[in-house]
Amino acid sequence: MSAFGNTIERWNIKSTGVIAGLGHSERISPVRSMTTLVDSAYSSFSGSSYVPEYQNSFQHDGCHYNDEQLSYMDSEYVRAIYNPSLLDKDGVYNDIVSEHGSSKVALSGRSSSSLCSDNTTSVHRTSPAKLDNYVTNLDSEKNIYGDPINMKHKQNRPNHKAYGLQRNSPTGINSLQEKENQLYNPSNFMEIKDNYFGRSLDVLQADGDIMTQDSYTQNALYFPQNQPDQYRNTQYPGANRMSKEQFKVNDVQKSNEENTERDGPYLTKDGQFVQGQYASDVRTSFKNIRRSLKKSASGKIVAHDSQGSCWIMKPGKDTPSFNSEGTITDMDYDNREQWDIRKSRLSTRASQSLYYESNEDVSGPPLKAMNSKNEVDQTLSFQKDATVKSIPLLSQQLQQEKCKSHPLSDLNCEKITKASTPMLYHLAGGRHSAFIAPVHNTNPAQQEKLKLESKTLERMNNISVLQLSEPRPDNHKLPKNKSLTQLADLHDSVEGGNSGNLNSSAEESLMNDYIEKLKVAQKKVLRETSFKRKDLQMSLPCRFKLNPPKRPTIDHFRSYSSSSANEESAYLQTKNSADSSYKKDDTEKVAVTRIGGRKRITKEQKKLCYSEPEKLDHLGIQKSNFAWKEEPTFANRREMSDSDISANRIKYLESKERTNSSSNLSKTELKQIQHNALVQYMERKTNQRPNSNPQVQMERTSLGLPNYNEWSIYSSETSSSDASQKYLRRRSAGASSSYDATVTWNDRFGKTSPLGRSAAEKTAGVQRKTFSDQRTLDGSQEHLEGSSPSLSQKTSKSTHNEQVSYVNMEFLPSSHSKNHMYNDRLTVPGDGTSAESGRMFVSKSRGKSMEEIGTTDIVKLAELSHSSDQLYHIKGPVISSRLENTRTTAASHQDRLLASTQIETGNLPRQTHQESVVGPCRSDLANLGQEAHSWPLRASDVSPGTDNPCSSSPSAEVQPGAPEPLHCLQTEDEVFTPASTARNEEPNSTAFSYLLSTGKPVSQGEATALSFTFLPEQDRLEHPIVSETTPSSESDENVSDAAAEKETTTTQLPETSNVNKPLGFTVDNQEVEGDGEPMQPEFIDSSKQLELSSLPSSQVNIMQTAEPYLGDKNIGNEQKTEDLEQKSKNPEEDDLPKVKLKSPEDEILEELVKEIVAKDKSLLNCLQPVSVRESAMDLMKSLFPMDVTAAEKSRTRGLLGKDKGETLKKNNSDLESSSKLPSKITGMLQKRPDGESLDDITLKKMELLSKIGSKLEDLCEQREFLLSDISKNTTNGNNMQTMVKELCKPNEFERYMMFIGDLEKVVSLLFSLSTRLTRVENSLSKVDENTDAEEMQSLKERHNLLSSQREDAKDLKANLDRREQVVTGILVKYLNEEQLQDYKHFVRLKTSLLIEQKNLEEKIKVYEEQFESIHNSLPP
């Protein structure tokens, strides 16, 4: 480029003029096209210019660019064209300047877009690109219409071909210089042009270049400001080529054009319109050209101006092109770079611009006629070419402004619109109307102004024509310091300068205004784009503020939109208004930030985000660093009232729920969660809080009980045990379910005993707890006052949420009433001995708390609904029933029943002996009866201490006086201790032998079997409870009588009597001993039946118990049995649930096993795995809400049916039971050797085989009953499934089905893992120093693996629990209360029956293995 520029410097001005005359405007401009209409400022800002950015060659002085804009100009090419060495002596420069209309000549190949532009005198500003194009077109027009006199010499210039074809070579340049004088000689000027026309046909035919030209003859003088500018602002898509349609239009229009040309006026060099020889010659040349175009249609048509105003041709490669003069212009004179660019543009059909300005005002009617014909066709042809990007506004202007006269200067003004140039539009303040107003204004003043401007432009053109005709010396140089406007002013001074002054003033005012605005826009654009990315541009309103404030958050960017309608009006405001509005926006922006942005949290909240999850789970146990700040310490709590403590805990819970709540939860959901959590929390904690009733507190003080603060300390320590911790975590996490009670039962049994607290302290603590719970009970606070706190507390912990609330409401009040009555009744007349013994027992009983006994949880509340008298009678039984239910929940309920049976069957003398111990209990029993928590163990003097507790509660009711608070405590404890003591004194074997020795061994044996079942116990308990109602039941006779009366009175009595007989705890035992021994079997049967019917009611969920009295009595009996079991075992034993009361058969089996193992060590491993099964069951019950009564129901049914039809199996009844045994076992039994010739050990093995065979038979029967129950439950499940399917949505029904299906899978998996794990643990427990290290390592590895697998399975269980909650929530929407209870019962029963089935199968498997091993060990 620079080399080419240097070469151009050697050209003289005449050559420059010739080059200008060769029609640069018609030349293809590969670099800059219509896109120069796009403001450079906008292009640099938006980065969306349509072509590569090239600088304009130069800017004339009329543009008045200051130094800041000079960087946009190309000073090198300015010097190249306007050579400072040339002097304007003969006016050649002025001619050229006037010809070019104060534009720039794109000599270097950086051609500006081919736009006909305004003269400098036009009212409106014109861009340099437009001026340049206009100059070149004007030059070509003048050359065409030169002096007609010289046209006759047109054949004499053959060497111009070389001139046209060799411009790029130095010789070509020299030839240009040689031809200068000829070119500008008046005599030769028109000859050259004529020669061009003459050579056109040959050149076009040789090179195959097609040019369609329809209206050259219409190119008279060019007055753009007076012409309708249909395409003024258009960037023509078809600028690169003539579309087919346009080509057709040209052919069609030729005839019309020719006709027009014949009559059209033409302008001579003097500016006059003539129709002479010259015009006819020109027409002839054009006709020849048209013919040549038709013949060689393979060329490229670049652009066509249907009105003939200006032409731009797109030549083929290296082919000369024909300009409007008829001169051949070869594109090769451009440098190599530009030619390469042009080639690429041609191949891609890139933008080639045609700018059209019609000559309506000058050419007159003929031109108008042709314009009207071609206007629509050309518009279509231009628009159909979509290869070039178009500006939206331009296409609109084509349609809207066809009939309006718009000066070229409007182009830039209207380009700055919100649609096409939004950024410049905003930078200009939205005030483009100032530019557009003159254009659209049609008032007379404006029109006069436009006419004046048109005249001025015409005058300028006349000047340039006259100057062109004047000869100039070759050495004439352009003056360096003269600008275009200055040259125009020179001519103005010659002419008088009047029109020049008008022209300059109008031009300067508009140009200066435009330039100033452009400066501002450029500055803003540069400032914004120099350091901003497009995707990070500042929001537009900020540009009105010199120093916009820092934006605190990203929301600031979202606060404004560049597309809103309000924005446009905002930009038209003044600076002050913009600033003020921006300030307002700032404040609004801050508010928006608070809503949608990042939320700032306090340090305390931030700590919460990183708090330990395990701490969050402890709602009422321990403090967290910040959440418990409001809660007082234990020391301070003593000084606080109960209401304050509860209020603080409620506040903590609410705050914790708020902080832990998920951000994506709605406020309504959070409130609901908080409410639910609060309800659960209150349910759990109610029992641990003291009764606010002052009367109760006075009673506590009179009783010498520790105050609530002491008890709270005790309870907190108790809860610190692992079992309670686990339970509370479950509760706090909301994952606790109906089986929580079961879990905590087992945990609690082991937990309480190790506490090692004194019995008095524990007992007092228990009572305190109950006091707090009692306040919630039925109407009578008196009765509520006497309730046993320990029972309520345990109940609240162990039972399900529903159970807990229910127990707290009913049971606690009953216990309260009992305590209150107990206090009154302590003074009740009774055996002094009993009172003393009661006191003595108090110490013992305190040694064991209710928790230790495991019966602390009292579930029965139904009795509270009865009258106060009934409540008194029921108190003891109710408590016991709850305890019994608790035992029922625990896996060890069977053991308790067995123990109770043993006690019941225990020798009468033992009962008397127990009486000595329990005697005080009886007297205390009156007290105990008053204390609901005290065990209703004394039912009669005859019965062991356990019996006494049962009767004691009735007696307590009879004895309203409560003389000695200590007594009531003692009685409570006594009840437990006497029962346990009696049990300890009476070996299980003794009890069994007694049962057998009694006339009722079979029935009682059955009863013992029933004792496994929870219900029979309950029945027995119920009966004693009824007997308790008799006030003076201390004497065994009285108790038995009362019991008998109650039996007759109530339907429950027969049940209780039956149950009681086997249990032997209650007054029924007295009846059994004296009156009703023969009756017992019947009662047992009926009680069993009642049990079966009431089993579901006596399930873990106390609320479901159908018969409250019965349930309570049963609970009391169970509690007694538990106490006995625990005493027989050691209070410290944690595995009470594992250790069950053993029936006589079980004891016989154990004795046989011991004897056999002592003599045959080979059977040791197979005969001692029974504990594994129990441990597995315990593990399962800790995970699932076992409906123990329902599970036991099937076993009980089998035993009851057996009791009805036949006596208990005898040791030798092996063959009788063989019918239900597996065929393999039956075959072994039939093949066993004769006992006569066998030694002692073999006989024992034979006996053990028979025992195991009978066990297997029983298990098989139980399995049959269990399968029938499972079948029934499955039927219920199918009915439930059908109902759910009808009511729920398909996706909800699918969730329900998935949950039910996965429930069985998870239960089976957990049971299998638990069984395997317990087996491995048992094996590890037998490891000693003699065990192989490899075997030990294998056991450890298996244990670790199974433990991890079981933990994973527990995670599955946790997930299953969550899904259960979801399903329950779904069903709540569709099912009524009864249906919902049916669903819950179905799920619980399904789980319980499934676990029981697995347990039975495991038992049968174990017994079969034992049977086979023993049989194999027998001699042949």
UniProtKB/Swiss-Prot annotation:
GO terms for molecular function: actin filament binding. One of its GO terms (cellular component) is adherens junction. Its main location: membrane. Kidney, proximal intestine, oocytes, and to a lesser extent in the distal intestine, stomach and eye. Epithelial cells of the cement gland. InterPro entries: ASD1_dom, ASD2_dom, Shroom_fam. It is found in: Apicolateral cell membrane; Apical cell membrane; Cytoplasm, Cytoskeleton. Gene3D superfamilies: 6.10.250.3120. Residues 225-269, 556-582, 746-801, 827-848, 937-965, 1021-1082 are annotated as: Disordered. Residues 518-620 form the ASD1 domain. PROSITE patterns: ASD1, ASD2. Residues 559-571, 787-798 have a biased composition (Low complexity). Coiled coil: none annotated. GO terms for biological process: actin filament organization. Residues 1150-1419 form the ASD2 domain. It comes from the Eukaryota. Keywords: Actin-binding, Cell membrane, Cytoplasm, Cytoskeleton, Membrane, Microtubule. Residues 254-264, 770-785 have a biased composition (Basic and acidic residues). It holds the Pfam family ASD2. Residues 225-237, 943-956, 1049-1060 have a biased composition (Polar residues). The ASD1 domain mediates F-actin binding. Induces gamma-tubulin accumulation at cell-cell junctions and may direct the assembly of robust microtubule arrays during cell elongation. May regulate the surface expression of amiloride-sensitive sodium channel. Belongs to the shroom family. Interacts with F-actin. Interacts with scnn1a. This is Protein Shroom1. The gene is shroom1.
